[in-house]
Structures are given as structure tokens and as C-alpha cells.
From Swiss-Prot:
Localization, UniProt: Cytoplasm
Origin organism lineage: Bacteria, Pseudomonadati, Chlamydiota, Chlamydiia, Chlamydiales
Protein known as: Glyceraldehyde-3-phosphate dehydrogenase
Subunit structure of this chain's protein: Homotetramer.
Organism, as annotated: Chlamydia pneumoniae (Chlamydophila pneumoniae)
Active site: 151
Highest taxon, organism lineage: Bacteria
Length: 335
């Protein structure tokens, strides 16, 4: 599969790292970003959180050279002017965060690409796929613009699926304690979205909205109207944690919930959901490729139907890994 990356920020760079790390059959032809190629090369080579890329990396004649691989740099603001038709692009990995509406993402298709995968929650009627949860519903005949949901939805959905399949869910509230991201400010400043969001990310725990819980219903429709949530942005570089407070349909014990999570992590959700019963903290999961790591020691029960569950996730690496998984699934099932 021939792909291009539009937007080479945190997720775009980590997606490329994952593709190259696993020697994927996915071939990256080009990267489109308005930042100069030499600066993008530097940011790809050196990463303050995930370390230096282990191969030779350099910029040469408007190309990113990684080992023996050569990837063209483009710098085009107008998506419809991009040379996707000439390059024979099968799929655009849309990582700018700007083209989340179907009509905007379809501009890549108008430029000659066959499909678009958005690395963010899609707006409107864009099909949303979470690996391990509903990815098998992908239809190559009609799903040309798709979304990989958000990192938080990718963490919450596997946990919710295990609960739904084994015990049923009456209702639930989710809180994600989320690492800082590039959209936040280092010192206080104005924010268009909400005033609190403009406060300095190094000095504050910042309450924020998130559509992650409601977005779970896009891949698990049975939960519509049963889940919602919020976020706290906290001053750490990477790794976030979901706190799910949930009322179940069936009476059970916390031990039985743990057993169900462990079994799922070893069978249907292997490689997606992990299970830990060790005394872990957030930094222990930097670089984790799992969507969700269920923390058996952190959860609690109030009674036989009301529980608080905890799951960790590397909101960068875990999410980027799922994008590559979804790419490869689309490739395999579009032939």
C-alpha cells in the first residue's frame, strides 16, 4: 500500500516511526507539511519523549532519508493541489487535525488519493473504527474516508467491550487524566475553545471536555446514551489514564471483572488490551504499543454492580500503533 502523511506533528512522526520499525508493507511516499523539511527531519530524528530514532536520518534535496528509504517532502497548503494522482497514492494518513469533516477530508480523494484515514475523531457521518472492537465492520466498497477515533476512545472502548460482553453496562462516567499536548500553552494565554484551556500546562491541572466516552458509541452502538466523560490535562509529557466508574447490568465481583479482562487480553484483544497487577505508575508505560492497559490493583468496588476501573495508555505510541494496524487491515481487506 502506498501512503502519504499530511501533517508531520507528534502523531504523524510517531506513525512513521511505527511503520519503519515493523518493516510494514505500507510504503510512505511523501510527507506534506508547511514546516521546512530540515526542521521536520530534526524533529523526527530526535524525540524528547521516545528517544533518538535508531537509524541514520538526514534531509537531502527535499527528501527525508531514513536508512535506505527516501520520502519526499511537500509543502502545499491547498490539499487539492497535492500530487496524489501522479504518485499513485492509495491512502492519505491525515494528521493535521484540520480535516476532520468528510467534505474536507474528501479533498484528498479529489486530488487523486483512493482513501483517507483521519488520525482524530471524525465529524459527521465518518465511519469510526477501533482496532479490536469494530474494525471488522470496515467495508472497502463504501468506506473511503475513515477515522481511527481518539487515543482515549481507543483506551476506553476495549475495556467497555469486555464489560458489555460479560456483564452488560447500565451507565458509566469516564475521566481521563491526560498528558499535555501540543495545542496547550506553556504560559497563560488566550484560548478560543475555552478560557481554562489557555492556562499554562506546566503549572496547572486543567479540567477539559472530551468526546471520547460518547465516541465509544460509534463503535459500540449498544452504549448510546449510557456513557459520557470529561478530562483533566496534567503537566506530564506522555501517558494518560482512564478512570471508568460504571454500573453493570449483572451482579459480579471485582475479581471476576479482572479475570474477564485478563482472559480478553490473552485472546480476542491480544495486542490491544494488556493486563497488569504490578505497582505501576504512568512513566512505566512510555512507549507502550497497547491501546489500553488494565490496572488490576487500582480498581475498586462499591457493591456487586458499581465499580471504578483504571486503564493506562501511551496516548502517543499506542495510538500511532493502532493507526498502522488499521492501515494494514485496510490494505489486506481492500484487495
Amino acid at each position: 500500500m502506498k501512503v502519504v502523511i499530511n501533517g508531520f506533528g507528534r502523531i504523524g512522526r510517531l506513525v512513521l516511526r511505527q511503520i519503519l520499525k515493523r518493516n510494514s508493507s505500507v510504503e510512505v511516499l511523501a510527507i506534506n507539511d508547511l514546516v521546512p523539511g530540515d526542521a521536520l527531519t530534526y524533529l523526527f530524528k530526535f524525540d524528547s519523549t521516545h528517544g533518538r530514532f535508531p537509524e541514520d536520518v538526514r534531509c537531502e534535496a527535499d527528501h527525508l532519508i531514513v536508512g535506505k528509504r527516501k520520502i519526499q517532502f511537500l509543502s502545499e497548503r491547498n490539499v487539492q493541489n497535492l500530487p496524489w494522482k501522479d504518485l499513485g497514492v492509495d491512502l492519505v494518513i491525515e494528521c493535521t487535525g484540520l480535516f476532520t469533516k468528510k467534505e474536507d477530508a474528501e479533498k484528498h480523494i479529489q486530488a487523486g488519493a483512493k482513501r483517507v484515514l483521519i488520525s482524530a475523531p471524525g465529524k459527521g457521518d465518518i465511519p469510526t473504527f477501533v482496532m479490536g472492537v469494530n474494525h471488522k465492520t470496515f467495508n472497502p466498497e463504501k468506506d473511503f474516508v475513515i477515522s481511527n477515533a481518539s487515543c482515549t476512545t481507543n483506551c476506553l472502548a476495549p475495556i467497555a467491550k469486555v464489560l458489555l460482553d460479560n456483564f452488560g453496562i447500565t451507565e458509566g462516567l469516564m475521566t481521563t487524566v491526560h498528558a499535555a499536548t501540543a495545542t496547550q500553552l506553556v504560559v497563560d494565554g488566550p484560548s478560543k475553545k475555552d478560557w481554562r484551556g489557555g492556562r499554562g500546562c506546566l503549572q496547572n491541572i486543567i479540567p477539559a471536555s472530551t468526546g471520547a466516552a460518547k465516541a465509544v458509541t460509534l463503535c459500540l452502538p449498544e452504549l448510546k446514551g449510557k456513557l459520557t466523560g470529561m478530562a483533566f490535562r496534567v503537566p506530564i509529557e506522555d501517558v494518560s489514564v482512564v478512570d471508568l466508574t460504571v454500573r453493570l447490568d449483572k451482579s459480579t465481583t471485582y475479581d471476576d471483572i479482572c479475570k474477564a479482562m485478563k482472559q480478553a487480553s490473552e485472546t480476542d484483544l491480544k495486542g490491544i488490551l494488556d493486563y497488569t497487577d504490578e505497582q505501576v505508575v504512568s512513566s512505566d508505560f512510555i512507549g507502550s504499543e497497547y491501546s489500553s492497559i488494565f490496572d488490576a490493583l487500582a480498581g475498586i468496588a462499591l457493591n456487586d454492580r458499581f465499580f471504578k476501573l483504571v486503564a493506562w495508555y501511551d496516548n502517543e505510541t499506542g495510538y500511532a500503533t493502532r493507526i498502522v494496524d488499521l492501515l494494514e487491515y485496510v490494505e489486506k481487506n481492500s484487495k
